[in-house]
Amino acid sequence: MGKSLADKQELVAEIKDLLKDAQLTFVIDYKGLTVAEITDLRNRLRPAGAYCKIAKNTLMHIAVDGDETWQPVQSLLKDSSAFLIAGEDVASAVKAYKEFRKATKKTELRGGVMEGQALTSDQIEALGDLPTKDQLYGQIAGAINAVTAKIAIGINEVPGSLARAIKAVSEKEAA
């Protein structure tokens, strides 16, 4: 038995709510995936703050209708579509999907939308090669730490150099 109108309206509202906070949505063809594999994909996406929604293309069309940011996704709505919706950490979500696809070899990335711009599958894959948010934080913290360490070494070096110079002069005069 199909879903009731209330169920469909609830699903559309849920998709709209997810899209409200999303940075990236990409569409995959999930044909041939088992329920266990879809659950595995969802579990891989969850730590990245991303979601996998499976809905009829018409329901996704209704969910994005009137929202200029997500309009380009309509061109990707065909066949069996799963919608991967990523929040802040786009790179981690794409990496999680790429790992899943490598493990299952069953899905096809059609494309996606980011900030109102349609993206090809190659562009989305390139996003997965970027460092994650945590990696960027680590790189920034390391750079800041390196600068402060160099300043501290420089500040400590001035009195040390002065002391060595005074000692060398005093030893030279004593000799």
Curated annotation (Swiss-Prot):
Part of the ribosomal stalk of the 50S ribosomal subunit. The N-terminus interacts with L11 and the large rRNA to form the base of the stalk. The C-terminus forms an elongated spine to which L12 dimers bind in a sequential fashion forming a multimeric L10(L12)X complex. CDD domains: Ribosomal_L10. Forms part of the ribosomal stalk, playing a central role in the interaction of the ribosome with GTP-bound translation factors. Gene3D superfamilies: 3.30.70.1730, 6.10.250.290. This is Large ribosomal subunit protein uL10. One of its GO terms (biological process) is translation. It comes from Picosynechococcus sp. (strain ATCC 27264 / PCC 7002 / PR-6). PROSITE patterns: RIBOSOMAL_L10. Belongs to the universal ribosomal protein uL10 family. InterPro entries: Ribosomal_uL10, Ribosomal_uL10-like_sf, Ribosomal_uL10_bac, Ribosomal_uL10_bac_type, Ribosomal_uL10_CS_bac. One of its GO terms (cellular component) is large ribosomal subunit. GO terms for molecular function: large ribosomal subunit rRNA binding; structural constituent of ribosome. Keywords: Ribonucleoprotein, Ribosomal protein, RNA-binding, rRNA-binding. It comes from the Bacteria.
